[in-house]
UniProtKB/Swiss-Prot annotation:
Keyword Phosphoprotein: yes
Membrane topology per record: Peripheral membrane protein
Region (Disordered): 189-212, 416-445, 460-491, 504-546, 596-705
Positions carrying Phosphothreonine: 196, 463, 515, 683, 701
Span of the annotated motif Nuclear localization signal: 197-203
Residue windows of the WD repeats: 47-89, 96-135, 138-178, 214-253, 269-308, 313-354, 358-398
Composition-biased stretches (Polar residues): 189-198, 460-475, 596-607
UniProt pathway: Protein modification; protein ubiquitination
Modified residues (N-acetylmethionine): 1
GO biological process: DNA damage response; DNA replication; mitotic G2 DNA damage checkpoint signaling; positive regulation of G2/M transition of mitotic cell cycle; positive regulation of protein catabolic process; protein monoubiquitination; protein polyubiquitination; regulation of cell cycle
Protein name: Denticleless protein homolog
Amino acid sequence: MLFNSVLRQPQLGVLRNGWSSHYPLQSLLSGYQCNCNDEHTSYGETGVPVPPFGCTFCTAPSMEHILAVANEEGFVRLYNTESQTSKKTCFKEWMAHWNAVFDLAWVPGELKLVTAAGDQTAKFWDVRAGELMGTCKGHQCSLKSVAFPKFQKAVFSTGGRDGNIMIWDTRCNKKDGFYRQVNQISGAHNTADKQTPSKPKKKQNSKGLAPAVDSQQSVTVVLFQDENTLVSAGAVDGIIKVWDLRKNYTAYRQEPIASKSFLYPGTSTRKLGYSSLVLDSTGSTLFANCTDDNIYMFNMTGLKTSPVAVFNGHQNSTFYVKSSLSPDDQFLISGSSDEAAYIWKVSMPWHPPTVLLGHSQEVTSVCWCPSDFTKIATCSDDNTLKIWRLNRGLEEKPGDKHSIVGWTSQKKKEVKACPVTVPSSQSTPAKAPRAKSSPSISSPSSAACTPSCAGDLPLPSSTPTFSVKTTPATTRSSVSRRGSISSVSPKPLSSFKMSLRNWVTRTPSSSPPVTPPASETKISSPRKALIPVSQKSSQADACSESRNRVKRRLDSSCLESVKQKCVKSCNCVTELDGQAESLRLDLCCLSGTQEVLSQDSEGPTKSSKTEGAGTSISEPPSPVSPYASEGCGPLPLPLRPCGEGSEMVGKENSSPENKNWLLAIAAKRKAENSSPRSPSSQTPSSRRQSGKTSPGPVTITPSSMRKICTYFRRKTQDDFCSPEHSTEL
């Protein structure tokens, strides 16, 4: 009693305005211990040890040392905690129920208590007289919790596994020998996310009728904040609800609506519940023991519904773990599933708790003596009850060390690692990592048959810019392909030039060429890779012509006269293709050839002389076909591109001026022989041909070949004259 008076002094204990004390009571927590005389085993009807489920200290004046304990067999025992002799400690016991008693509560200020059991009833007991004062009947399942208001002696509340909360009043008359509920909250903690809408409830009488059963939404704990306010928690919805008892919840058919709700503040995705609720002495702070191993502290007076503090370090895996506050509201104690009890300082929730060790099974119900800070009671599934006392530091006897069955320990602070980026090898990545390029893994690179020029295939994002090692054969083939592709002139330019060239060289009487255009002809030549790319468009045209065709210049003015051209005056071009040549045989010079052949029979001597003269002239070498050549050098010197160092005359296919001196002499002689002739001596065909002569000299390329008709000259009247006449001329 001296210690209690010291704690109540303002300078040492709780201050008048509230929380902290000048005296460091935190250091006293390590002095709690349990002697073997304070350890009590809970027995059943047959003397078999059974686990105790609930314990609570009396609130009657000068009777605060009385401890009531209920066990699984329905027995209630009263312990005098002032006596440390085991024989005198338990002074009274009786069998309150034929089933397990899950909770019990003292009537405020009196030696009376109410027990809530698994037989679906609550019983009202007079402890001093040892009499049953009444039975409360109305639940359809086990009762899990019972609570009294702070200043009410006749009204109490119970919550059961049927999901209902019932309010009882012992002042009401009994019917059939049982007390009936005066108020009821049905389905207090039903989940709101139902797949189908609930059926409308029928209006029920608030007294004596059986309520609906909802065992899946069990009410685990009820607690009074004041005379008109009730706080409750469920097993699976994770919501703490505050109810106003002045409202009649049975008068409506819809679901009951709480005046205030505290949603589950944790991070678990599983539906969790609360096993215990504790209010401080002022009723403004609520401590909720959740099955996610946390105790949440809520402010009941404000509008904020999130917790103001969280206590952790213990384990809570069942709904039998309870909590309690010290008489000065400075410390919070809770049972735990790891065979220990934990004590936290309320003002320092981050501080490691003090651990009470000594039990061998889960610690369920705990209670701090409301009038004595130095006394704590704990129940465990090891079938024992331990009363913890503060070591006063008196002289210890030699046998006291061996009689200690409970001791304290300071829990070490767990250092939580800061959030650090975990390497990808230790964590599952969000996406598959990109494979690193290596000589052995070359799947992103192109195959050997794929064109290797830039722009054919885009590089994948995971493919490095450097080339992957390949075999020498593959390297050589790729180099040759690159060389051949780079040496070819641009396709659009060559196709355009060839189409323009075909259009220019075509005449109204000529037919389109049989061979496909150069843009569609895809015949590769070995010489392609060896010919350098021309810088001018004319050079590209010449190279394109040399690859695709070997052309001949059909010149009509070979031996007759420099001014004489083709009979049709078209400067046509034929190919070295048999089919094309046969098709073009009658295009332009058919009439002229027939005339020459007809005249050839009249003058065989002169024509033979002319033919001999024509054949004696050295003809320029014909261009070498790129298909027949196997060399790797450039084209022969006589084959020069068109337009290089010369001027284009007449047609687009004209060649630069490169006259042969023998042909020049022959042409000069022909001019001298034909100059004295009179206009009357000329035939109409000759006059027609002379009128169609070109104004300038016609250039002959060394690489072009003469037409067959140019080897024969048309005979005139002068050719049939006598030799004397020709000598005179």
